[in-house]
């Protein structure tokens, strides 16, 4: 443990805000603490200092990160601020502290809306998320929010006078559609979870479609789960639109399939099921040819 007396403190001053103090010896910040004046020991130098409300400290912490990684916060003298803004926007991975703060504040607002029980709040959260995705502001926080919206009412049921008040299939459907814009392994896991737990064919269809757009099929996990879903709904609630989307997803994932026999069997079950429309069964015969040839 470092000697507390040897630890030096520096202050970062941002116009219009109170100074933020951090340890110059270990160059670290202590964990965020609840609101109020709380004495927090430095994680490395064991020196205590006072921290204010976390909402105020968030802006300062972003400023520290920006200076540490060389992100421009204020334009240099003799330069045009608009030029710096254009360069920052064009670099892709660079953003100003103000932009980072707005993204953080946006995430807080969306999280509160997602946690709300009301339907209207969740609709508004989806609108905010869609605007963020269209603006190129995708993040892990948005992915987590969409995952929560996609499972709203599935694993936590709230009842009032015996009536379920948090079952929102339209919210789950739209969340599954938006998850396709954030392709990752976490997105794939969230969609598979929705697909296995939801009873609404429309929501399951949206999850299946998004899985095809994400395109991740490690060890045939995605196609195997889709095959199980196909057999499940074929037995309890055969739906032509769901079967058609399953076929389309099989076609998209054909290049990633290892065990083609299992996929072909699932497709042929749809083709041989007389409860589906002729167009769906004809589509199954088209897809099976592509799967056999490896999606070529």
UniProtKB/Swiss-Prot annotation:
Which segments cross the bilayer?
59-76
Coiled coil regions in record = none
Fetch the Gene3D superfamilies from UniProt: Leucine-rich Repeat Variant
* A Pfam cross-reference name: HEAT_2
GO CC terms = membrane
Q: Where in the cell is it found?
A: Membrane
> Which UniProt keywords are present, listed alphabetically?
Membrane, Transmembrane, Transmembrane helix
Bilayer topology annotation: Single-pass membrane protein
Does Transmembrane helix show up as a keyword for this record? yes
Claim: Membrane is one of the keywords in the record: yes
Q: What is this protein called?
A: Uncharacterized protein TP_0608
